[in-house]
Amino acid sequence: MAIDFSLSPEQQALQAGARQFAAGVLSQVKATIALHPAHEDRFFATRPFYAQMAQAGFVHALFPKAYGGSGMSIVDFALAAEELCVADINVPSTLLSTGLGMEPIIGYGSEEQKRRWIGEILEAPGDRLAALAFTEVTGGSNYDSPDPSAGVQTFARLEGDEWVINGQKHYTTNGCGWDGKGAHLISVVCRTDPGKPPAESLAVIVVPGSTPGVEVVGYLDTVGHRAVVSPRIHFNNVRVPAGNILGKPGDGIAICQYAFTWTAALIGAACTGVMRAAFDIAFDFAKNDKRSGNVPVIEHQNVGYMLADIKMRIEAARYLTWKACHQLDVTDRRSDELAVMTKVYSSELCVQAVYDAMRLVGVDSYTVLSPLSGLMQDALCFPLYDGGNMGVRRRQLHRKFRAPGYDPMASAEGR
């Protein structure tokens, strides 16, 4: 049977619907957030857009049908995500971050935990956010360090039938919630024993953001993703029931890998969307601007070559994303190599593609009046976040290559 990249009628309808939503709703985000100089206020200003996204069914798409969601495949979610990110990166990132906060529950929660916490989000999908509290103030790349004195320094100790959590996190996307006090649910990556390595002590404990001791202490004002909130959060003697742990101590490494594998593949879709936006701007400029010459600049060979390079990067990123997402769907995420490759490759392609679009347009692209300057600010984030390409993602691939019996053709052949 031939390999077929055609979309089904249902997928075409999903893609068209997401494109229409992006053009009709998300295209207004930039002008709205421009009115707010403070980082957190820009985020709060996107709440109506997120509510419309929830009404359109995108929050339900994060969850399996068995727990009230629509059960959308990762491939289908990627199709929609690409379209959304052509128009705006901010509100789709808030959606993706709610997914990241809930992925530990989806993958490792008990039946009771899944029904309870997914149900809570879906009771008010436009109002309730989830977050993953992963990154320590000192960094997150060494979260799995075998040295107990290094890595995660947020600790949970068991006192009777409660976990008592103390520590500090930052870059906790969505962590402040819409009220600035805490997301509805925060999946906290912590250790249960300071004397044991992560393989024995790393855990994920679900903390309602309204729990006493959860404190939003500040916001990191990022260069790009201007309305994606990145708060610092302190956990000061936060008490939650012992039953709020997902799995058992020591499962934290697997849980984090499960969650970040999902986002790794989908970041490829976000990067593809941003590259498309940059290409559209450069293409329109090339067709219509003569730069004081006699013909539109697209008639010049070098301009055509640059457009070709950008378009090739878009196509390569899209199809690697599709394959990675398909492989996650059919293997229940047991095969994650392509997802990690997608995150690294697409994010670095995106930076180069946007830069080439800026080079094509010239110095005018470097002003704040040009949308390309904003797209570059957004693109620069992709290689650095969600497991930085150097600190985490390439290390994941290196670890795979070093493993006994590694088969370099396994991911290519869907094994």
Question: What is each model feature region?
Answer:
Residues G140, H170-G177, H225, W262-I267, ...:
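Glycine-rich phosphate/pyrophosphate-binding beta-alpha loops
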Residues G126-G139:
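A short, Trp-centered hydrophobic/proline-enriched beta-strand micro-motif
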Residues K30-E40, F283-V295, K311-Y345, M358-Y366:
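C-terminal helix-coil-helix/basic helical segment that borders enzyme active sites and/or dimer interfaces
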Residues I3-A16, E215-E315, S411-R415:
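Glycine-rich beta->alpha junctions and the first turn(s) of the following alpha-helix
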